[in-house]
Amino acid sequence: MKIAITGGAGFIGSHLTKAYLDAGHDVLVVDTLRHGSLEAIDPRARFYHMDIRDGALQSLFQRERPDIVSHHAASRPEARLPLEENALLDADVHVRGLLNVLEGCVEASVSKFIFASGGNGFYERPETMERAGKVDSVVDEDAPLRPLKPYDITKVAGEGYVRYFTRQYGLPHTILRYADVYGEMDVKLAQHPLTYFISMLLEQRRPIIRGAADEARDHICIDDVVRANLCVLTRGQNQTLHISSGESHNVSDLFRAVATCLCSEIEPLYLSPVLSSTSAAWTLDNTRARVAFGWRPERDLVAGVQWVVERFCERHGWDMPVEAVYNTSSNERYLVGAR
């Protein structure tokens, strides 16, 4: 098949590009390189330096006639911009850009549209949380949606537009709601705290963990995400699916896993660690994906951290410390400041 992947120079997109090529598909990558890396793109793919908001994208689809479009292009908050400008950027990329891609799919008679969405920031807190003090909540794809951040709001809106194009124009789709994705990557592409912790500890520097959040999140290894995307090339028609580990871990858990794997005694610097009166551990139920196409995550947090550390050391020429056993009893959750 011929597959067009938007955002193919980013962390998830570059891994998918390689996997599609390894599976024998013809792949074209569309990316602005604003946040992605040209070096991350597999040289076997054809690269188009293009913004998804550009009208030329529709001409490209008309010319290339991809069978499948895998939409992984997304905005990223920029520290130099005020909050309202970042919110406008999210809307511009995730709504206007998405509509441009969807229109191009319809005009080019694309057979399927795969939409990379989110999950951890989408769902409404149940009322029982406030009464119980702490709730470990497993949510499925039908749970009430209540996104609070502009990024998540625009992604939820994007899902609505994808479904609209299916109803209105018959464009088949699969929506994948990812947990927080981690894996081996270039540092400049890193957005997950695991990569931050690994790089800081290997450089014998003290990581900074700041914030006042107390909820755990679901984390999924990039290898498991790639396998799910390969599955939905031919399955999961018009479904919305969690691609998740089915487990929740707080940021302190992540740090302890990395520190133990690296045999490091360095402690993080906690800035303003204020916990609220309630503590939620959100877990994304992945039963629907398991049933739809037999997918299941293969790496838990311990195995995933070990794999990422090994790959990171290989990439940067560091020696792996002796093997250690991961163990954590921490129940605190802090936000990483340097993401």
Language model features with spans:
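NAD(P)-dependent short-chain dehydrogenase/reductase
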Residues: 127-134, 152, 160-217, 222-226, ...
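N-terminal Rossmann-like NAD(P)+-binding domain of SDR-like oxidoreductases, especially those catalyzing
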Residues: 1-174, 339
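Residue-level recognition of beta-strand->loop/alpha-helix junctions
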Residues: 31, 177-180, 272
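Hydrophobic pocket-lining residues that define ligand/cofactor binding sites across diverse proteins
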Residues: 105, 166, 201, 232, ...
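Gly/Ser/Thr-rich beta-alpha loop segments that engage phosphate groups in nucleotides
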Residues: 9-12, 38, 120, 185, ...
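Pocket-edge positions in alpha/beta enzyme catalytic cores
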Residues: 50, 61, 82, 90, ...
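C-terminal substrate-binding subdomain of Rossmann-fold SDR/epimerase-dehydratase oxidoreductases
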Residues: 204-339
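A short beta-to-alpha transition loop/helix N-cap that caps and shapes the active-site region
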Residues: 36-38, 123-125, 185, 251, ...
